[in-house]
């Protein structure tokens, strides 16, 4: 068997991102064969990922990537906020975003097979799991390709926004930040679904009917509230966050700009997190 040197262990650690002891054990098992040791670690990484697959991953970050007229946002989840800040996990999110942008995969399953800088996204994910010891999942992504421009905004990596727009670069940045702050549901009022409008109309009609006013007045009250609702939830109707005296629609008109589409991800949005009652756990332990 070839001698296992410190340099071999160090080189394997650099290649895999795993710990020194794991790398040394793999080299011993492979009898000093570097390629075989690397393969052993990849297999073990996959096994570790499978064992952790059922564990809830509700923390994480948003990764982004923009190249010319193509941009992508990706939500990647882990189990704790501590791991979400680790460079290895951040690298996974960035690699996933780049893969989405360059390959335009159909879904998360297809994304796993995309190769970035010589490695499949799934291999990068499994290596990160093996190194950091937490379950990690790529939850969702969005990709825009446009003849206009793409702007992204990340707020603490917990909120991510991507905007497909035309106009000055600063306008794109400002609109992306505005979306993160004001959270519109769509660009314009014609994009609000009929189902949403019907639901709001029912609520406002019931509220207005309680006023006891004539039917024609009630109808006007309902329409007024619907118009206010549309202004509150649409990007164009909202007061611009950096200058509330103007709407986003007016800002865009002044800058000869337009917004075709936007998307926003919030980490963990819609994932039911387990609430741990530590006081109850301590009390239960004390009774043992």
Curated annotation (Swiss-Prot):
Protein biosynthesis among keywords: yes
Protein name: Elongation factor Ts
InterPro entries: EF-Ts_dimer_sf, Transl_elong_EFTs/EF1B, Transl_elong_EFTs/EF1B_dimer, Transl_elong_Ts_CS, UBA-like_sf
An annotated GO cellular component: cytoplasm
One term of GO molecular function: translation elongation factor activity
Key word Lipid biosynthesis present: no
Gene from which this protein is expressed: tsf
Keyword terms: Cytoplasm, Elongation factor, Protein biosynthesis
Organism: Chromobacterium violaceum (strain ATCC 12472 / DSM 30191 / JCM 1249 / CCUG 213 / NBRC 12614 / NCIMB 9131 / NCTC 9757 / MK)
